[in-house]
Structures are given as structure tokens and as C-alpha cells.
Amino acid sequence: MELRKDKLLMFYSEGKESKEAKWAVNDPMSKSYKLSLPSALRPDNLLPGNRLRYTDASKSKSSKVSWYKTILDPGSEIVLKWNWVFIVSCMVALFIDPLYFFVPAIGGDKNYPCARTDTSLSILVTFFRTIADLFYLLHIFIKFRTGFIAPNSSTRVFGRGELVMDPKAIAWRYIKSDFIIDLIATLPLPQIVIWFVISTTKSYRFDHNNNAIALIVLLQYIPRFYLIIPLSSQIVKATGVVTKTAWAGAAYNLLLYMLASHVLGAAWYILSVDRYTSCWKSRCNGEAGQVNCQLYYLDCDSMYDNNQMTWANVTKVFKLCDARNGEFKYGIFGNAITKNVVSSQFFERYFYCLWWGLQQLSSYGQNLSTTMFMGETTFAVLIAIFGLVLFAHLIGNMQTYLQSLTVRLEEWRLKKRDTEEWMRHRQLPEELRNRVRRYEQYKWLATRGVDEEVLLQSLPTDLRRDIQRHLCLDLVRRVPFFSQMDDQLLDAICERLVSSLCTEGTYLVREGDLISEMLFIIRGRLESSTTNGGRTGFFNSIILRPGDFCGEELLSWALLPKSTLNLPSSTRTVRALVEVEAFALRAEDLKFVANQFRRLHSKKLQHTFRFYSHHWRTWAACFIQAAWRRYKRRVMENNLTAIESMENEEGEVGEELVVVEEEECVEESPRTKMNLGVMVLASRFAANTRRGVAAQRVKDVELPRFKKPEEPDFSAEHDD
Amino acid sequence: MNKIRSLRCLLPETITSASTAASNRGSDGSQFSVLWRHQILDPDSNIVTYWNHVFLITSILALFLDPFYFYVPYVGGPACLSIDISLAATVTFFRTVADIFHLLHIFMKFRTAFVARSSRVFGRGELVMDSREIAMRYLKTDFLIDVAAMLPLPQLVIWLVIPAATNGTANHANSTLALIVLVQYIPRSFIIFPLNQRIIKTTGFIAKTAWAGAAYNLLLYILASHVLGAMWYLSSIGRQFSCWSNVCKKDNALRVLDCLPSFLDCKSLEQPERQYWQNVTQVLSHCDATSSTTNFKFGMFAEAFTTQVATTDFVSKYLYCLWWGLRNLSSYGQNITTSVYLGETLFCITICIFGLILFTLLIGNMQSSLQSMSVRVEEWRVKRRDTEEWMRHRQLPPELQERVRRFVQYKWLATRGVDEESILHSLPTDLRREIQRHLCLSLVRRVPFFSQMDDQLLDAICGCLVSSLSTAGTYIFREGDPVNEMLFVIRGQIESSTTNGGRSGFFNSTTLRPGDFCGEELLTWALMPNSTLNLPSSTRSVRALSEVEAFALSAEDLKFVAHQFKRLQSKKLQHAFRYYSHQWRAWGACFVQSAWRRYKRRKLAKELSLHESSGYYYPDETGYNEEDEETREYYYGSDEEGGSMDNTNLGATILASKFAANTRRGTNQKASSSSTGKKDGSSTSLKMPQLFKPDEPDFSIDKEDV
């Protein structure tokens, strides 16, 4: 291990010369390490060694060696893609192999059938199988170049574990574990047997070789099928699932079912041909007459000489082996012979056998009527067992995928039914029930049954903040109150904003209730009204639109230096006119932000708050109305004073009024210190409220006093 | 659209205090909404959801209707095909009605808004209401499939087939019609999947009840059987016709007979050339599916002719084909005996695959639906089994086990397994308050202590009240335990008793009925100016006599309400609290009894002093001293009480007189018991144990300000 660590350290220290270092790391480092030379001499040895070898080796060799010696990470993207490609090629190879069973066929005519070989089919299947074998070979090569996790308990206790990158250790581990199975699966056995068969022409060898092909393909099928199981588990271990969507999983299971039908049909076909030809052979060997029967007479490639033609005229082999009238019992293989499946074209043969396999597999072989032949009975037992296993597997997997598709919908349906049952149990009035149903419907449309809070809580802090910034920041900047803040303050506020959904007709807050959150409207409209504490004759109503906020009493409360627990009471009643989507900032979150970020205490925010606060606008409107009425009263009294100049008592009353006006002017004097920005905002405000003021009717009755709203304490010194 | 919206955000809102301006704007909005409602529809509104359901039903009916075109050809005579014109006309009529629904669907898609993708970041998203954008988006996505499904192709072929039948190409026309219906079946089936998705997206489910979902899946299964049976029938007719065609070509090749293609059409039955050909030819014997000597292999299609399906009337034919499809679909085609013909084999493979898929889907969906029906009952059953197993594991005594079972049964009756808190918590604040007001307010007003509060205070208290269930025999509080909640009795009876701190010889017991409350020490604690964390200790033991349903107000909620609402601190509430508090009543009863005993003792001493001479002067002086001490001790309390009583108004006097009337019976009983005790030992009665005056909650506002 120490030697490996030293090599790794040398490898990483010389990053730029990685190729040369890899080339040189074997010979001089190991030698120098064994000789235990002092460290000062190592660079002197390395430099001339590198130069000498660099001059000797060509560029192509160095690039090939570097590619050849690359060690792959088993969790990396390229290995995962290769696993996918390899599992697909394994499935295709499993599909190609049973096509070898269709190579033997029955030729000739009805009177004189003979056994033949479909040479074009064998060549085609061999070609495709060779391509599939190349994938297996490439798989072995990649396994020799893929690292593995060290099995020591100390490395896997925490995290993912350490990778072993030594080629020798990788090769040794692979040879000890999976190499034998991979080698058996890779061997091109059917190709060798096929090319050996083509060279021979004798019939008895032909029959023997047919059985040899079937046996070899079946034997090699087992390791090839076995390869898929650890490959699937590797994919599951790396990514969590084999298929990304549920429908792909269902299609994958159906494909396995079709593959089993394909193998079963092909096996049935070759067993039928074998039964047919074995009948011929037994009758041919047992036939004793004028002309002896040779086995090559049954081959379609025979010479057709005089002896064979004489034998064909007198023989009774084909009559005895007739599937309809003969003595031989074919059992479940009789259909293949009576319906001329074994003597049809390839596509007819293939699709009929696929249909036969599918039929028997899905009905667990209950249509089969067998003879006492042991091979046939064993085959039927295998069909029944595989049918049961595959059918149950198919239904179970389909059901699992269906449930995963509809689990969210079922949860929603259950919740809706629970709510309906609970409302009926508690005998809520119909109006309340309709409101609850409308809110549930709206919540489904907005969230589709997914709990956003739970999803966000399971992510790390940085991701959560980035996601909430993506969700909130563009919308929050639309609110003018937030546009004055900097990014850090906005990030802190975005983390604490909660989306709030209100259906039509909902009272968000009533006058006199406690305010527990501040709402910033994103979509929809709200009606905000006040009676100034229930005073008769006073009513003010405005429409809040996207970009406005309500619950601004909470900001005054949050900026108070004394942290009292009492929440402020609302001075307005807020009701949703249409469906409203808003961001809510809760009381404790607002107090936390106000305490943490001193930048919230600034005059700029104070002026923006005054400008956009409807509370302040209402007060300003009342103030202007009171000033106007005072002006009109003063003008009228001046006229009256001018008309009636002789009464002294009225003059005294006028003096008192003048004194009151002077006091109010004194109160207004601190406002003259505001800067130019405030004056611009004030003039804009005055221009916008001109229409509202003009619409007011002149009332001689004294207007009830509207209290000035409590101003939030934006000063930073007071907190200190 | 975005520019207009941004401009609106920049402009500050004007204060609309004028009523005329508000009325004008309201009327203008209503007119605009009427115009808007007629033009562009909201995809989540009720009218679009209703239309989606209607269109889904009509689409399924159209899928059911199209395979009837396959039954139009039939065997009308020996070796000839004919066309059922009445059936074709009927199916064409109904299909035209279905096509009108498809046309209306296309029109609705041009008038339905969609949610802009960029606005889906928050909430439900914003709707795009521009007609041009809606049309452009629809043309780019689903328009081609909708048009392909809407085209009246079979109608055109039918009207072309009828005049072309005179040419003798009946089979060719039939094949064309079948091919067109099959090709159009694909987009028509494809329409249902996004329609299902849209309905689920809007409402959350396809069917409201589980049984409707199961019936829907079964209906799809029967629809597949119907299509499969129709295809089998048409393929059988095709195989029969191909056999006739082969024999006809063979006759022409042998030059024995002249066989025209029109001979295979039933319209040529009366022609003499056709009759001569029919008598001489061997087509009937060669193409007879019922005969075993025929050379042509009908395979699975022979059944259509052995059972006379192809020549019988429509209703019998249709029902047999439906049965054939249902049988082979549900058994994955295992009863089919096929020939080696390639088309037949492919058809059987398709039957088997569709059978597997539909059977698996049916079982899976049925199980999901059935599971959702009984999920609450199963949860409750599992919970009860867990409870029983846990009680057995912990070896609880049988009496405790019985109490647990009784409580679990009672809780099921009260809630039916539904978690009320989670349902309420998922609703917004206003709805939650309305529901809790509906649930609590009429019951809370029955408690006299709450009737003194105003609506706003009651709303806040209703928001904090939690329902509490106790079975008979349960001790809610024990004397000396900390009080963590205040109970207001709604149903049932509670026994409240005290031994005044475990003092021997003292016992007071009352029965609390609906409208009473217990745990009133908590109110004293909540109104203290200094917020201490220690909960008060209970001075009484409270036990449930029957099953009790009450509202509980927890300690932190009570402190929150007391701090938030200054109106809780008022003299009116103080008097109501004293009047209805059983603790104060007990103290009042003890005070009255002590006063009475003091009066009787003073009277007896006075009488004795009159009759006795100067020889007994020393013992009289001792008794007088004791009496004086007791009088001084109670006089102190009496002074304080008297001082506060002087300040009360007329309402307090009325309450006091009502209080005196209610406690008259209790006083009489206590007097009789005290007289009995006096007879036993006068020394014990002389040393009467003193009940401490209960702590009074601080209702004054001035101290709070300090």
C-alpha cells in the first residue's frame, strides 16, 4: 500500500507531464525505491531517463499507451453508459441465439421428405452473433480497466469509499471473480461448429452436429443470461432504478416475457424436428428387405443414385412416420408436423413458433396433451413452471408500476374523501363546505399534490437558497418596497417568504384582529377597508393590486426597540376579491430580519414605506381634507368678519382659531428638513390623490379625527 | 401583455373614495368580464372541465362505434358477398354525430387559454389570453392529430362505395373501408390519453369514486374485446373471399370455365352466366369450411362459418363476435387453433399481448381502487392490533386494558379515523377560523364564563380551544398536581373534590355539569404581571363520572390570550369568575359556616353568663379570649372583602344575592353535619380548621402598565 501511495503521489505531483510520468513510473521509480536511493538523486535520474525514452518512443505509441492505460471509475458517466449499452446488446444476443434452432428444416415433397439445412439463415445468424460477440469481448476489456472500491472496512465506513486504481490488482481481482463466466459467454462456439459442419456431407454426422449445435447454444445460454443479473444490480446501485419511467419498466418486463416465448417456441421447433427425424432413423435402421436403408438417404444433399431411388419406391419409413396415420406418437410436437410448420418458409416458421410459445406460456401449458416420452413430459413441466413464474412476475411488476404512477393521485383522492367525510361528520354548513372545496381545488391546481416544504427541507442549505432565490427573487422585485433593498437583504427575506393562497371572499384579516404576517401581493386583487376603530360615519376602502402589501403595522412592531410579545392589532379589514397569490412574511421572521440586518433601518426605506403604505395614504388624504375644510372655514369667517365688524366676541373667537393654526404650523416645521427625493415623492403623491380629493363633497359637519398612524422606528442609533 | 402589466406596476394606485367612480369601474369590469367569458376560456374553469368530461365520453363512444363498419359485408348467398346498406347508413349517422363533437372540440381548443411556462415559478401561473398565441400554440402541438381524428373518411368511402358497387369491386371497397377505419382508429385512440391527463391535471382524478374507476377500466376491457371480435369477423370474411378468388383463378387458368370477378358479388346471382358457373364449378366444395376434406386452411377463422356467424342477422352476429373477443382476450388466445398463415399468426400474437397487458392493467387498477376504499378502516384495524399487541407485551393488568379499549372505541366513534388536526392545519387562516367558530362557538357560549366576552375575544379563544375526551373514572387532575390546562365541560359530569391540602376531617365535593369549568387556578397564573414558568398546583381532584367531552385551553394559549387582549382584565369578568368559580363557592360556604358557628357560640356564651354567678368567672374569661381571637382573624378578611364590596355596582349586588340563593341548600346540609360533629366532641368543633382564601386573579390594568 505504501508503494502504491508513493506512486499515486508521484502521479499527481507531475500533472502536466502525466503521460511521461506514467511511462516512466514503472521502471525507474520501482528500481530507485528498492535501491533506497536518497531523494535528491531522483530528479537527476528521472530527467535523462525521460529524455531517452521520449526520443525512442514515437508519438502514436505514447498516445496509444496513454489511452490503453487509462483506469475508469465504476461510478463515472462513461461506465454507466457502457453498462446500458452492454445490457441492451446482451438482450439482443439472447434474442439472436435461439435463431440457430431454426437452421435444420424438412425439405422434399410429401411422398419423400428429407432433412436439410437452411444455409442462408445460418450464415445470417452467424454474422449477427459475431457482432454481438464483439460486445462481449469489449466488455471483458473494459472490466480489466475499471477500478473497484477497496473492500477494507475502514474505507467504506464513511462516504462512498476509496478507489483502487492499480492495473495489477484490478486484473487479479477480475480473474478471481467473474472472468470465467465472461469467457464462457464470449466463446464463439456455434460459429466453430457451423463451419465444421459445412465441410462434412455425411448424414449421420449431420444429425449428430444438429444436436451438438442445440446443446452448445443451450449451454452457453445459461452464462449469457446470468450476466444480466449482476449488470442490472450494478445499474440499480449506481442510479437507483433500471428504467427512468414506469412505462419503460412495464415495457421492459413485457419484453422479457416475449423473449421467454421466443426461446420456448424455438426449443419446441427443434425438438419437433428431432422427433420427426428420430422416427425416420429408427424405422430406417429397423427396415430389412430387398434394399438396405442408408442414413444418408434421409439427407436432402444426397446423390440420388439408383440404389436410393429403388429404395424410395419400396420403403415404408415415411408412411409409418406420418403424423396423421402413422404409428409413431408425436404428442405435443404433432402440431408442428401436421401443419407443415417444419417445412414452411422461415418467417412462417418463426412467427408460428413465437405464437406457440406465447400461448403455452400464458396458459401455463394447459392445452398440452403429452405422451409418456420422458423428454416431452419434462419439457411440459418446464413450460408450466416458467409460465407461472413469468406471469406472476409480469402482473406484480405491472401493478408496482401502475401504483407508482398513481400514488400521488390516490393520496389526493383519499385526502379529499377524508375532508368530505369529516365535514359531513361535523355538520358544517353548506357555504363553509363549498369554500373548503374551492380552496382544495385551488391548492391542487397550484401544487399538484406535492408538498413543497418537505421537498425543500430535504435539500442542503445552499441548494435551498438558490432554489428559493429562483422562485422568489424575480417576483419579489416587482414589489416596490423590496426594490430598495440590496441583494443580501433580499436573500434573507426570500428564504423566509412563504407562499400564501387565498380564494375569493376570504377575509385575510379583520379590523381589530391580531396581525401575524405581512402579505406582498403577486397576483389577484384585495379590498382593504377601515372604519377607524368602528367609528360611525367613517369608511375608507381601496383596492390592493400586484405589487402592494398589507399588514404594514407588523413592520412598525418589528422595528420597535423593546421586544414585546404582543402582536399589533389590525386597523383595516382585508378581503380577497379574486383568487390571490401572495408571499407572506411571518411576525417572528420579520423581527429576526429587522434585528439581524441593520440596513433595514434607513431613511430611504422609511420614505419608500410611507409612499407605498396605504395606511399613510389614508392619513394623508384625511389630513388634506381637514386642511381644506379649515381653509374654507377661515375664508368664510373672514367674509363674515368683514361684514360684521362691530361685534367683539366673534373677533375673540377668530383669534383663538389663529392660535390653533399656528400650533399646527409649528408641528409641521420638522418636515421642511426632508431632502429633494422626499419632495419629489410628495409631489407625485399629491398629483395622484388630486382626483380623490376633488371628488369629495364639501361637508359643513365636523369631520371625525383620524389618528396619525404609528411610525416605525427606522433610526439605527436608538437600537444601540 | 408584459409591458402593460409592468406599466400598471409602475403607476401608483389612486384612492377610490368616490362612490360614483367605484360604481362606474364595477360596471365596466362586469361588462368586460362578460365579453371576456364569451371569447377566451380558463382551462381550469368549471365549463372547460365539464366539456372535457363530455368529450371523453363521446370519444369512448366513437371508439365503440367505429368497429361496426366491419360488420357491413356479409355472406349473402352461395359464394358471394353482399353489403348491409341499412347498417352502413345507421352507423354513418351516429358517426357523423360523433364527428360533430370532435369538430366542437377543435373549436374549444382554439378558445381555451393556457398557462405561460415562465409564470409557473410561483403558484398556479398566469394565463395567456391572446387569441393569436393560443391558435399558434394549438397549431404547433395537437392540431394535426385532432384533424386526423375528426375527418369523416368512412362517410366518404360509404358514399363512394354505393355507386361503385355496380362495378363488382365490392371486396376491394370493403378492404379500403376497413383499412381507413383502422388507420383512423389510431389518432382517435391517441386523443384519449392527453384528455385523461388534462382531466387529472384539473381535478386530480378521473372518477370520483373507486367503483367508477373500476367500472371505467372494465369498460375499456370490453371495448378492446369489441374491437377484436369485429376484426376477427372481417378477417374471416376476407379469408373466405380469398379462397373463392383462388378457385376462380384456377378455373380461368384451366380454361374450363369463365369466372368473372363480378360473380363473387351477390348482385349477379340472377344472371344466367353466373348460374351456369355456379352449377359447374367446384368452389362450394373446395371452399367449404365445415367440410374436413377442403384443402384451404381456414385456421382460427373456420369458426365463423361452422357456427353460421357470417350469414346470420346483425344482433346475433355482433353478440357472438363480442363473446369471441372477450373469451380470447381474457384467456390470451389459448383456445385458438391456427394455421401457418402469417397474418393469422401475427393476429394471434397481437391478441395474446393485448390480453396480457389489459388483464394486468385491469387487476392493477382494480386493486388500487379497492385499496383506496378501505384504507382508513385498514389503518384503524392495524392500529388496534398494534395496541392490543403492545398491551399484551407490556403485560398491562386487565382493568387497564379494558380502559384503553374503551377509550380507543370512543375515539373511533368521535372521529371515524380522520385526523382532524391535519385537515384543519392544511386550510388557510380565515377558513380555519370560520370552521372553528362553527364547531366551538355555539358550545362555548353555553359556558357562562365565556358569555361575558365579546366576539373578537371569543374568536381568539375558539382558535386555541382543543377538544378533550375522557372516559368514566378518569382522573383529570389530582390534588397537588400542576394544572396545565383549563377545562370547560360541554357534555358529561365531573366530580370535583378537595381535602384542603390533605387535612384530615375536611372534605368538599361538587359535581360539575355542562357549562362549568375547572382548572381555574390557571387563570390566576396567566394574569400575573410577572410571567413565571412554574405552573400552579391544583387544589382539587377532578374525576370524570361519565364520558366527558370538554374544551381544553392549554397554559401557553391562555397566557397568550391574556397578554394579547387587555379586555380580559375587567371587573365584569372578575365578578363572573368569582360567581362561577367552585373554588370561590367553597370558600364562601366555609366563610358562611364559620360566621354561623361564631354567632351561635356568642349567643350560647351570653345565655350562660346570665344564669351563672360570680364563681365561674375564670372559665368565662378563657372562652371570651378564644372567641375574640377568632373574631379578629376573620374580621381582617371581612374588612378587606367589605372594602372591595363597597366599590361594586348594582350588578355585583344582584350577583351576590343570586349566589346566596344557590348556596342555601349546601349551607343547610353542612349545618346539620356540623351539629352532629358537635355532639360527638365539642373540643374538635371548637378547633375548626381554617380554609385559606383562594388567590384572586389580578384583573387590574394599572399594575400591568407598571
UniProtKB/Swiss-Prot annotation, chain A:
Its membrane topology: Multi-pass membrane protein
Region (Calmodulin-binding): 597-612
InterPro entries documented for this protein: cNMP-bd_dom, cNMP-bd_dom_sf, Ion_trans_dom, K_chnl_volt-dep_EAG/ELK/ERG, RmlC-like_jellyroll
Transmembrane intervals: 86-106, 122-142, 179-199, 212-232, 253-273, 378-398
PROSITE patterns reported in the protein's UniProt record: CNMP_BINDING_3
GO cellular component, one term: plasma membrane
Subcellular location: Cell membrane
A molecular function (GO) term: cGMP binding
Annotated Gene3D superfamilies: 1.10.287.70, Helix hairpin bin, Jelly Rolls
SMART domains, A to Z: cNMP
Keywords: Calmodulin-binding, cAMP, cAMP-binding, Cell membrane, cGMP, cGMP-binding, Ion channel, Ion transport, Ligand-gated ion channel, Membrane, Nucleotide-binding, Transmembrane, Transmembrane helix, Transport
Boundaries of every IQ domain copy: 617-646
Domain commentary: The binding of calmodulin to the C-terminus might interfere with cyclic nucleotide binding and thus channel activation.
UniProt protein name: Cyclic nucleotide-gated ion channel 17
Gene giving rise to this polypeptide: CNGC17
Curated annotation (Swiss-Prot), chain B:
Membrane topology: Multi-pass membrane protein
Domain of life: Eukaryota
Transmembrane spans: 54-74, 87-107, 143-163, 175-195, 218-238, 346-366
Phenotype seen when the gene is deleted: Male sterility.
UniProt keywords, alphabetically: Calmodulin-binding, cAMP, cAMP-binding, Cell membrane, cGMP, cGMP-binding, Cytoplasmic vesicle, Ion channel, Ion transport, Ligand-gated ion channel, Membrane, Nucleotide-binding, Transmembrane, Transmembrane helix, Transport
Region (Calmodulin-binding): 565-580
UniProt topological domain (Cytoplasmic) ranges: 1-53, 108-142, 196-217, 367-706
Record annotation: effect of changing residue 491 to Q: Impaired cGMP activation of the Ca(2+) channel and strong defects in pollen tube guidance
Ligand binding (a nucleoside 3',5'-cyclic phosphate): 449-579
Localization per Swiss-Prot or TrEMBL: Cell membrane; Cytoplasmic vesicle membrane
GO molecular function, one term: cAMP binding
Single biological process term from Gene Ontology: intracellular calcium ion homeostasis
Region spans: Disordered: 661-706
One cellular component term from this protein's GO annotations in UniProt: apical plasma membrane
UniProt-listed Pfam families: cNMP_binding, Ion_trans
Keyword check for Ion transport: yes
Tissue and organ distribution: Expressed in pollen grains. Not detected in leaves, roots or root hairs.
Keyword Zinc: no
Record CDD domains: CAP_ED
Annotated family: Belongs to the cyclic nucleotide-gated cation channel (TC 1.A.1.5) family.
Job of this protein: Cyclic nucleotide-gated ion channel required for directional pollen tube growth into the transmitting tract. Acts as a Ca(2+)-permeable divalent cation-selective channel inhibited by either lanthanum or gadolinium. Regulated by CPK32 to mediate Ca(2+) transport across the plasma membrane in response to Ca(2+) oscillation.
Subunit note: Homomultimer. Interacts with CPK32.
Domain remark from Swiss-Prot or TrEMBL: The transmembrane domains are indispensable for pollen tube guidance.
Name of this chain's protein: Cyclic nucleotide-gated ion channel 18
Species lineage: Eukaryota, Viridiplantae, Streptophyta, Embryophyta, Tracheophyta
Gene (UniProt): CNGC18
